[in-house]
Amino acid sequence: MSQSLYLVSNKVKIGVVRNPFERAVTEYHNSLNYIGFDEWLQANPMQLQKEMYKDMDVLIRLEDWEHELEELELPVKDTSILEKLFIAPMWNNWYTLKTRTSVADLYKEDILTFGYSL
């Protein structure tokens, strides 16, 4: 299931957003479901990250977290949660036209808000 991922630095709340296309494959992989990815997407909608992180002061992208934290010049003491996080390898190979369209429709707000694409 979807879970919030955040860091705290000097009382600044930093939300870490994920590419919705990568996130969907990772959540499918972690679910140990034996139905196909197409069916799983429809049966298991993820919560929009836009809503999950609405109380955060800053949002950074998971795939570039080290660089983004460096640019913010915020000392974060513990990044082990980010270092241990599973990211589905070759996640973009999972997509067909149908699944790409499904994720794009289901998570349109996150894709537009955070500037993601497949």
Where do the language-model regions lie?
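Membrane-interface amphipathic segments in extracytoplasmic regions
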Residues: 1-118
